[in-house]
Amino acid sequence: MSPVRPRFYTPREVSRHCIVSDLWVSYLGRVYDLSPLLELHKGDVLLKPIIEAAGRDISHWFNPKTGDVKTHIDPQTGCLKYYTPQGRFLHTAPSFPCSGWDNDFGRPWWKESTYQIGILSSKTKFIRIINTLTSQEQALEVCSEETIREILGRYLPYNGHAGSYTWKFCGLPLDMDKTLQENGVWDEDEEFEELKIASDLYTPSIHLYFNDDLTEL
């Protein structure tokens, strides 16, 4: 049995989850739902920096090589300590020895894989999906790593019968298990940037042709 493919998220999707009861963050290329953590430690003042960062990327908190919180030499004590200019947060030690510091919490939250829900896309793009049967058009932000089948999943809220259509680009059927790039839908953003042309002036269009089999997903 092949492993389950992780889901990809756009920064915009992460940013929508920005309240205490529904709090996501991203760091080091992964997306995390920290809502259970906040519920578990409800009322703890050390949650404040995490709550303030809700819906955002906090990769700058961490050392990309170790995956741990960044460290520095404390100028007052000369000791190595966590670098937390945003304020000390949950599971980081206090600056000075403290009898009330309980480090018997096991794995720190930033290394707890159970909070991970997916991968942050390295590049997103807007496409237009045009239903040739109804002439309806939908703009959709997608992840460059997603296959057409996964993009279909994003489109389902707008068309519950999306699986009953043949998906085409420039008149050619798309391979549903390949990405846009692998299907020849090239990302020209870099070329547009070199030419100083706004990338949103061109949005690739995917055309859907009804198969008349009433497939329901």
UniProtKB/Swiss-Prot annotation:
Could you tell me which InterPro entries the record lists for this protein? Cyt_B5-like_heme/steroid-bd (IPR001199), Cyt_B5-like_heme/steroid_sf (IPR036400), Cytochrome_b5_domain (IPR052320)
Query: Which organism is this entry from?
Result: Xenopus tropicalis
Q: Which Pfam families match?
A: Cyt-b5 (PF00173)
Where is this protein localized, as stated in its record?
A: Cytoplasm, Cytoskeleton, Cilium axoneme
Q: Which GO terms describe its biological process?
A: regulation of cilium beat frequency
- Could you tell me which SMART domains the record lists for this protein? Cyt-b5
Q: Which GO molecular-function terms appear in the entry?
A: metal ion binding
Q: Name one GO cellular component term.
A: cell projection
- What name is this protein filed under? Cytochrome b5 domain-containing protein 1
Described purpose of this protein according to its UniProt entry = Radial spoke stalk protein that binds heme under oxidizing conditions. Required for the coordinated beating of multiple cilia maybe by functioning in a redox signaling pathway.
**Ranges of residues in domain Cytochrome b5 heme-binding:** 6-72
Family indicated by similarity: Belongs to the cytochrome b5 family.
Positions binding heme in this chain are 41, 72
- Domain of life of the organism encoding this protein: Eukaryota
Instruction: Report the main location listed first in the record.
Output: cytoplasm
Keywords (alphabetical) are: Cell projection, Cytoplasm, Cytoskeleton, Heme, Iron, Metal-binding
Q: Which PANTHER family match?
A: CYTOCHROME B5 DOMAIN-CONTAINING PROTEIN 1
